[in-house]
Amino acid sequence: MKEKIVIALGGNAIQTKEATAEAQQTAIRRAMQNLKPLFDSPARIVISHGNGPQIGGLLIQQAKSNSDTTPAMPLDTCGAMSQGMIGYWLETEINRILTEMNSDRTVGTIVTRVEVDKDDPRFDNPTKPIGPFYTKEEVEELQKEQPGSVFKEDAGRGYRKVVASPLPQSILEHQLIRTLADGKNIVIACGGGGIPVIKKENTYEGVEAVIDKDFASEKLATLIEADTLMILTNVENVFINFNEPNQQQIDDIDVATLKKYAAQGKFAEGSMLPKIEAAIRFVESGENKKVIITNLEQAYEALIGNKGTHIHM
């Protein structure tokens, strides 16, 4: 069997100063060109991606157009919208590349639900800001309409709604994703960390939360029995003491040493630390698992061992 890889695209892959569809599609086109050698390789590929700016824009649109005739959609539904939108853009550009290569591979997007624990303590301490900024007066009105919602001041720029970021427990569509990936298909899944859902009676329902993309990608990689989790970010390597005079580049590291560095606070919370924690979980999930952390431009060189940070047991 060929190597199976989950590629977690960082936000920089689709980030642009302009928020138009055309500008974001152009950014994705450039990003996918960097992955062209991987698409031309025998590897079985699943791609996950972030959705922060996109879902933020959707939430602002929902708030501005909210009325009896066009009611605002909830966060879980906006998450599904963003998965479809970004998945469509990715499909278009990957399909363009596959056609140029005369490849017989196909590409498709799975709108992905991620099960979370309704008793996760993170629900008691929402910290993830989403959507537009509000004045204090607007927040007072919103809290009457949404009594369960939490709003916090954001660096003096106004107030924003904050939601929980629970840990993923399972990926509901993982068997479908695995079946597709084990063929020649390139699968786009777990966009934005997936749509958070909890089990209720004989089905699942969405909850107001945002799942960390790297944790969701790790869970997906584990469930589909991937060999490699590749986390693409905005730096070529992981560093300890990043941006300090004594910063040190890591090229190859075992999990035991990585855990020691994490415990010593060598990685920044909210940026590199979640990636490190996801890497540790995946490597420990089975035999011969590896994680590569690098930037988009070096993805293929990292896969063949020439670039990036390589993490193993």
Swiss-Prot record:
The keyword Transferase is annotated on this UniProt entry: yes
InterPro entries, per the entry: AceGlu_kinase-like_sf (IPR036393), Asp/Glu/Uridylate_kinase (IPR001048), Carb_kinase (IPR003964)
Gene Ontology CC entries for this record: cytosol
Enzyme class: transferase
The keyword Kinase is assigned to this record: yes
Catalytic activity: hydrogencarbonate + NH4(+) + ATP = carbamoyl phosphate + ADP + H2O + H(+)
Enzyme Commission number(s) from the entry: 2.7.2.2
Biological processes, Gene Ontology terms: arginine deiminase pathway
Keywords: Arginine metabolism, ATP-binding, Cytoplasm, Kinase, Nucleotide-binding, Transferase
Compartments where located: Cytoplasm
Pathway in which the depicted protein is active: Metabolic intermediate metabolism; carbamoyl phosphate degradation; CO(2) and NH(3) from carbamoyl phosphate: step 1/1
GO molecular function: ATP binding; carbamate kinase activity
Pfam families: AA_kinase
Superkingdom field: Bacteria
Family: Belongs to the carbamate kinase family.
Descriptive protein name: Carbamate kinase 2
Record organism: Staphylococcus aureus (strain MRSA252)
Taxon lineage: Bacteria, Bacillati, Bacillota, Bacilli, Bacillales
